[in-house]
Amino acid sequence: MKRYAVILAAGQGTRMKSKRYKVLHPICGKPMVQHVIDQVSKLGVEKAIAVVGFGAEQVKEQLGSQCEYALQEEQLGTAHAVMQAAPHLRGLEGVTIVVCGDTPLITAETMEMLIEHHMAAKAKATVLTAIADDPSGYGRIVRNEAGHVEKIVEHKDASEQERNIREINTGTYCFDNETLFQALTKVTNQNAQGEYYLTDVIEIIKADGGVVSAYQAPSFEETIGVNDRIALAEAERIMRARICRQHMKNGVTIIDPASTYISAEAVIGRDTVIYPGTVIEGETVIGEDCVIGPNSEIKNCYIGHRTSIRHSVAHDSEIGSDVTIGPFAHIRPLSKIDDEVRIGNFVEVKKSTFGKGSKASHLSYIGDAEVGADVNLGCGSITVNYDGVNKHMTKIEDGAFIGCNVNLIAPVTVGQGAYVAAGSTITDDVPGRALAIARARQVNKEHYVDRLPGKKKS
């Protein structure tokens, strides 16, 4: 049987108190609605329709061709939102799952079970329910003797007995597609809010003799909707724990999951250890047997095997195997660090390459540079790359040795195997295997201090 999906993503989200469109708020680095679409895409749907309203263009920019779009110009309720998908789905045979774009924790596994239960029950509609510790504010599920849905009672309309029911309506449904769009034509807005509600579709289907079933989600957490910053933080916490658990199941050691942030897209190899206070963002790939953290920030990096990054920041760069970075190093975007490199404490690397086995162990800035293999950069080495208008390249060839407190004024090349004496300011190219000394000769003034006014002779 063919499957379709409608993702409700038109709400403004006024309780978020934000300029950002609600469903675009990120959870673990990915917009809420993207989490939902990613899970829906695993269901093998023929069509996925995102119903958009406020911020429609931003949502389209985020989701692109992953789905089709229907515009809800006025937000007149959930049934009205689904009605906007009619031009895409009306008259098609199959089942349609309706899910909210602000439920980022829902999984494909739960939606798959919802669809399978719906089909096994030969239902016209199936409600995804959950057991809530505190069901206040939620619609309660009242079941009949057969276990099907007798009615959905909103909290404000529920009797004392009905309010004791902990099974709630999550707002996710599975419908027979043709039945859904037939019932939508009968929904009215004769209520205090003047809106069209999807729960009325359930009543219409029941009145027409259709079976309305219910499938209970494995956990309430999976079904929560994000309507304010408090719920956003809660969803972030749950998603972060879920991501950490999956990595740990895959063989990654995470010392303290509660203080570790890993994006949904990150890939981490087995036997890697993640220490507390570490943030791994974006599409980062980390190899096996690495040590990351504590207190490190990695974003959109490719990292090889057996690499250590401690108390450091690395963004948008490629880092090889058996590399040591930190503490307190900063690898800025577009850098490429080859195998067996050492980037030590208080070293900043910007848009530069380091060849195999090279070292910059302390207090250096290497920007817009090509550093060859087996190069040693002494403490305080600086590539002076900016002339106030343009950035210029520094090239340091294989085996070069740069002494402490050296300024390399770009554009400049230090040849293969060359030495640069400590304290030099290099403005011209240094030939291979040469020694460059670019500092004034030391002059000692004998008895100078004795001649200063007010100084006693010793």
UniProtKB/Swiss-Prot annotation:
List positions binding Mg(2+): D102, N227
Chain spans, region Linker: 230-250
SUPFAM superfamilies linked to this entry? Nucleotide-diphospho-sugar transferases, Trimeric LpxA-like enzymes
Q: Any idea which UniProt keywords this protein has?
A: Acyltransferase, Cell shape, Cell wall biogenesis/degradation, Cytoplasm, Magnesium, Metal-binding, Multifunctional enzyme, Nucleotidyltransferase, Peptidoglycan synthesis, Repeat, Transferase
**Superkingdom of the organism of origin:** Bacteria
**Catalysed reactions, as listed in the record:** alpha-D-glucosamine 1-phosphate + acetyl-CoA = N-acetyl-alpha-D-glucosamine 1-phosphate + CoA + H(+); N-acetyl-alpha-D-glucosamine 1-phosphate + UTP + H(+) = UDP-N-acetyl-alpha-D-glucosamine + diphosphate
* UniProt similarity note: In the N-terminal section; belongs to the N-acetylglucosamine-1-phosphate uridyltransferase family. In the C-terminal section; belongs to the transferase hexapeptide repeat family.
Q: How does it assemble?
A: Homotrimer.
Q: What is this protein called?
A: Bifunctional protein GlmU
Q: Which organism is it from?
A: Geobacillus kaustophilus (strain HTA426)
What gene is this protein a product of?
Answer: glmU
